[in-house]
């Protein structure tokens, strides 16, 4: 086994080992138990609640949680939108970067608001330092929103019969101060000491070894990059994201950034077990997610290590694997692992160019986002999986002739309808958007305001790969991921507006649905467990849930995958 694979395995195992105590700590934070950080953060949180006039001890029902969540996001959207729209005239712009167009500002504000960071611009020339700071703020709060929603779900599952499910603002502030901030500080310090810039000075002029005079972009990158991964956001400070030598300088920083994006999604699963005092249930959920993750990782890593068969046919040896679009300091194995970690977890950061990945890798990256149920982003990963638990419980109950129950609450028609709607919405948004873009491209439609030229102009690659680029853009948007096949010309009104709409719908409806289900179930009468109760903490139920995910989430996309990356794969044979 080569050292590259050992590095991949080592990082994965280390993250799991560290996620267990972090999960215990997260459960304590949401339960209100004492932690080591109380003396530091108690005064800060009291000050925040005092100046904002919020009573953090006031209990809310699920509708009040949603009202608070949605209203605060509206405020943040307009704040970010106007900063981006007028950044050229605002302070902290030493490189004199211009203001964004309205459609790009709309897309960017929504993208960071919903924890996606789709980025139809390049960081070096597209945003000022003030805009970067505002976007970094959104990276914190968008992750905090997802974690607060998960905390409400935890409370709903724990309580026997109640309408009150904690306080949204309490969960949100604690998520930001006690979890995201300390972890981000650790990651940022590691990055700074490894060579990532942390300054408010503008571009630096240098002379290369061959005598060329060039300008190198810098800025407060380390802080931005830390929360981009800890909060599973993924937006790059620089255009090349974590493939950029200043954003991810060494193999060590690559490991830190991989750990950073995986640690909270892993820990949230274990936190569920500690919070409910049901460790076995959490282990089953983690096991199902890990099996799904490995089924996506192994083909990807092997495909990248084995290289491009078209190049092999030319008699050219590929001892280092498929290196197109890869960074030499990382190599194909860990680049392939990162590409699945970042798409499964919904981070969306890249340390290689996904557009240059082998077709099998591209298919696995797409499938990771299409399934959207293994690990997932900060908090929302649990919400997505919760939907499939409800569906699996309902289907299992029908199969054995028992009333569907989950944690002592009956699953009835209303909850199943909500869960089914959420499960169907994801493929609908992806396939409808891709169909629209494909129609315009196939007819070479003159787009007018929507695009400067005919629709084929936004594709740099024809045929199967061009279709994959359009499919990937909408899949990434719907999964709130943010990575892309960057051969697509996406900075224009058509892509900025359509993906912006998909981003909004695919973020907030899948949060509203699980919160509604959890709130409805929490208000129902608790039914004690009996011999006839379907146990949800067994491997059999885990397999059932995996089957539901495979049938509903994965098979819905097979025709689209067959037209794109799978067809491309067979053309290389």
From Swiss-Prot:
The chain crosses the membrane at residues 3-23, 68-88, 133-153, 179-199, 256-276, 281-301, 380-400, 418-438, 501-521, 540-560. InterPro entries: KdpA. GO terms for cellular component: plasma membrane. It is found in: Cell inner membrane. Keywords: Cell inner membrane, Cell membrane, Ion transport, Membrane, Potassium, Potassium transport, Transmembrane, Transmembrane helix, Transport. It comes from the Bacteria. It is a multi-pass membrane protein. One of its GO terms (molecular function) is potassium ion binding. Signal peptide: none annotated. NCBIfam families: kdpA. The system is composed of three essential subunits: KdpA, KdpB and KdpC. Belongs to the KdpA family. Part of the high-affinity ATP-driven potassium transport (or Kdp) system, which catalyzes the hydrolysis of ATP coupled with the electrogenic transport of potassium into the cytoplasm. This subunit binds the periplasmic potassium ions and delivers the ions to the membrane domain of KdpB through an intramembrane tunnel. This is Potassium-transporting ATPase potassium-binding subunit. It comes from Flavobacterium johnsoniae (strain ATCC 17061 / DSM 2064 / JCM 8514 / BCRC 14874 / CCUG 350202 / NBRC 14942 / NCIMB 11054 / UW101) (Cytophaga johnsonae). The gene is kdpA.
């Amino acid at each position: 086994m080569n050292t590259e694979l050992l590095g991949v395995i080592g990082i994965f195992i280390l993250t799991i080992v560290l996620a267990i105590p972090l999960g215990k700590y997260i459960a304590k934070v949401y339960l209100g138990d004492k932690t080591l950080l109380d003396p530091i953060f108690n005064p800060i949180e009291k000050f925040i609640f005092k100046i904002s006039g919020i009573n953090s001890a006031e209990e809310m029902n699920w509708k009040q949680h949603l009202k608070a969540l949605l209203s605060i996001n509206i405020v943040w959207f307009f704040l970010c939108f106007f900063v981006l729209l007028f950044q050229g005239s605002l302070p902290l712009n030493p490189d004199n970067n211009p203001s964004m167009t309205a459609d790009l500002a709309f897309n960017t504000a929504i993208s960071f608001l919903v924890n996606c960071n789709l980025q139809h611009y390049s960081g070096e020339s597209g945003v000022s330092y003030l805009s970067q700071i505002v976007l970094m703020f959104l990276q914190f709060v968008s992750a905090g929103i997802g974690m607060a929603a998960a905390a409400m779900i935890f409370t709903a599952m724990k309580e026997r019969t109640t309408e009150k499910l904690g306080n949204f603002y309490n969960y949100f502030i604690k998520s930001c101060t006690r979890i995201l901030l300390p972890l981000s500080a650790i990651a940022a310090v590691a990055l700074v000491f490894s060579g990532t810039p942390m300054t408010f000075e503008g571009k630096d002029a240098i002379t290369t070894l061959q005598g060329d005079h060039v300008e190198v972009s810098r800025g407060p990158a380390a802080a931005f990059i830390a929360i981009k991964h800890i909060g599973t956001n993924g937006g790059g400070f620089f255009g090349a994201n974590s493939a950029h030598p200043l954003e991810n300088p060494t193999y060590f920083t690559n490991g830190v950034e991989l750990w950073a994006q995986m640690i909270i999604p892993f820990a949230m699963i274990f936190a569920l077990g500690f919070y409910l005092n049901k460790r076995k249930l959490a282990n089953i959920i983690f096991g199902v997610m890990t099996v799904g993750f490995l089924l996506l990782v192994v083909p990807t890593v092997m495909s990248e290590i084995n290289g491009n068969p078209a190049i092999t046919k030319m008699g050219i040896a590929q001892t280092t694997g498929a290196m197109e679009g890869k960074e030499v300091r990382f190599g194909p194995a860990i680049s392939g692992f990162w590409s699945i970690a970042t798409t499964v977890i919904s981070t969306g950061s890249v340390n290689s160019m996904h557009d240059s990945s082998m077709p099998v890798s591209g298919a696995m990256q797409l499938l990771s986002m299409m399934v959207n149920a293994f690990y997932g982003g900060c908090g929302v990963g649990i919400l997505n999986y919760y939907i499939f638990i409800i569906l699996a419980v309902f289907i299992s109950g029908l199969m054995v002739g028992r009333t569907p129950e989950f944690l002592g609450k009956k699953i009835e028609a209303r909850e199943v309808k909500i869960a089914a709607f959420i499960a169907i919405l994801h493929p609908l948004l992806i396939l409808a958007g891709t169909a629209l873009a494909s129609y315009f491209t196939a007819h070479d439609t003159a787009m007018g305001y929507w695009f400067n030229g005919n629709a084929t102009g936004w594709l740099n690659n024809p045929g199967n790969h061009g279709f994959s680029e359009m499919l990937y853009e909408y899949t990434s948007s719907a999964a709130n991921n943010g990575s892309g096949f960057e051969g697509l010309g996406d900075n224009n009104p058509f892509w900025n507006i359509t993906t912006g709409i998909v981003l909004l719908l695919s973020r907030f409806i899948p949060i509203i649905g699980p919160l509604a289900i959890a709130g409805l179930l929490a208000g129902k009468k608790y039914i004690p467990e009996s011999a006839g109760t379907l146990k949800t903490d067994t491997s059999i139920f885990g397999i059932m849930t995996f089957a539901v995910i495979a049938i509903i989430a994965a098979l819905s996309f097979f025709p689209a995958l067959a037209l794109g990356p799978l067809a491309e794969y067979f053309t290389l044979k």
